[in-house]
UniProtKB/Swiss-Prot annotation:
This is Pseudouridylate synthase 1 homolog. InterPro entries: PsdUridine_synth_cat_dom_sf, PsdUridine_synth_TruA, PsdUridine_synth_TruA_a/b_dom, PsdUridine_synth_TruA_C, PUS1/PUS2-like, TruA/RsuA/RluB/E/F_N. The modification Phosphoserine is found at residues 411, 416. The gene is Pus1. It comes from Mus musculus. Disruption phenotype: Impaired muscle morphology and physiology leading to impaired exercise capacity. Mice were born at the expected Mendelian frequency. At 14 weeks, mice display reduced exercise capacity, probably caused by alterations in muscle metabolism related to mitochondrial content and oxidative capacity. Cells show reduced pseudouridylation of cytoplasmic and mitochondrial tRNAs. Residues 57-68 have a biased composition (Basic and acidic residues).
Length: 423
């Protein structure tokens, strides 16, 4: 039999071929790696058989087995630098910043990090070491202080429906309202040009000292509102605010702060009580600075302090400046004007402008922040209690002279620390 006939016979019998160990037929290529018919997949010959063909099953990729169940290998998604627009009611929290090792003091970041892990945005070990996700907040709001426009920067996995998934693991009084991609080296604190805070207070705080401390029928007159705005405008510009914090000396350069604007809006009535909102925009603020700025203006309008105390407070002399309660303080907005000028129009990055989220911000304030301030003021009377302490301050002398009187502000009013945008 010649070779052509032998080759034809082999082809005719190919369908009935059965793999067996043994010598390979001369002239035929090795069959290792060819796909095995299903009937033969479970009957593989011994790989050690000399000259035998080895059938390999390659249809199913390898899977990890955990707990007796097949588990797909984890996806490896690239991390991206983003910013989140946050709103929260600060009541019941010990500020924004997480304090690792102090689990008894619950913070806003505790709930946020937990939600990020549960949503699948960050691995679990990033929750214990926030540096791994390059986390930074714009402002370190303190105990009891709320925010309508806080911004944090971090690296996350950009999963589908990311905002909905994060919010599903957050309490209703903490919301993520927006997300934007930013440059890889973006730092929300360092890139922030200015911050806008608002301070909501009952207008009876501006009533003359001869009236009842808590007169709920009081309504702010146009003349008094004009006086308030005239005094608040005095803060505009650069001044030495060492008397408005406990952290700075009169000659420390960092005590000088630049205020862009400060004014009081038209009053409004909630639950029969009239309120007003003071807004202040500045490059940065020190601990308690805004509360003391409000407190000193209230003392002047009520008739406890002369207007000249404002100028004295910016000098090197130590001046007794009262600190208003922390209840009404809210971080309203943060500004990134220089970043937007450089990257906002480059075609690669979005400007950090939250105009489209304004409706959600307003709705959150109306649903969570303002009602909390109103109800807490009615229940705890924090402003009325603080107003009762104003007569014990010595506005004509120095702060040292006031301390000699032995006067002390009730500890219940010290619970809510201030704005906390410290260096």
């Amino acid at each position: 039999m010649g070779f052509p006939r032998l080759w034809a016979a082999l082809l005719r019998n190919w369908g009935r071929w059965t793999a067996r160990p043994g010598p390979r037929v001369p002239g035929l290529p090795p069959m290792a790696g060819n796909k095995v018919p299903p009937a033969l997949a479970s009957h593989q010959p011994d790989r050690k058989g000399r000259g035998g063909w080895v059938w390999e099953e390659t249809e199913h990729p390898a899977k990890r087995v955990k707990g007796g169940e097949d588990e797909e290998p984890p996806r490896k998604l690239p991390k991206r630098k983003i910013v989140l627009l946050m709103a929260y009611s600060g009541k019941g929290y010990h500020g924004m910043q997480r304090n690792l090792g102090s689990s008894q003091f619950r913070t806003i970041e505790d709930d946020l990090v937990s939600a990020l892990v549960q949503a699948g945005c960050i691995p679990e070990n990033h929750g214990t070491d926030m540096r791994k996700m390059s986390f930074q907040r714009c402002a370190r709001t303190d105990k009891g202080v709320s925010a309508a426009g806080q911004v944090v920067s971090l690296k996350v996995w950009l999963i589908d429906d990311i905002l909905d998934k994060i919010n599903s693991h957050l309490p209703s009084h903490i919301r993520i309202l927006g997300l934007k991609r930013v440059t890889g080296g973006f730092n929300s604190k360092n890139k922030c040009d200015a911050r806008t805070y608002c301070y909501m207070l009952p207008t009876f705080a501006f009533a003359h000292k001869d009236r009842d401390v808590q007169d709920e029928s009081y309504r702010l007159s146009a003349e008094t509102l004009q006086q308030v705005n005239r005094l608040l405008a005095c803060y505009k510009g650069t001044h030495n605010f060492h008397n408005f914090t406990s952290q700075k000396g009169p000659r420390e350069p960092s005590a000088r702060r630049y205020i862009l604007e400060m004014y009081c809006e038209e009053p409004f009535v909630r639950e029969g009580l009239e309120f007003a909102v003071i807004k202040v925009k500045g490059q940065s603020f020190m601990m308690h600075q805004i509360r003391k700025m409000v407190g000193l203006v209230v003392a002047i309008v009520k008739g406890y302090a002369p207007e000249s105390v404002l100028e004295r407070s910016w000098g090197e002399e130590k001046v007794d400046v009262p600190k208003a309660p922390g209840l009404g303080l809210v971080l309203e907005r943060v500004h990134f004007e220089k970043y937007n000028q450089r990257f906002g129009g480059d075609g690669l990055h979005e400007p950090l402008d939250w105009t489209q989220e304004e409706g959600k911000v307003t709705a959150f304030k109306e649903q969570y922040i303002y009602p909390t301030i109103v109800s807490t003021e009615r229940d705890e009377r924090s402003m009325a209690q603080w107003l009762n302490t104003l007569p014990i301050h010595n506005f004509s002398g120095t702060a040292l002279g006031a301390a000699d009187t032995g006067a002390k502000v009730p500890s219940s009013l010290e619970g809510s620390e201030g704005d906390g945008d410290t260096d």
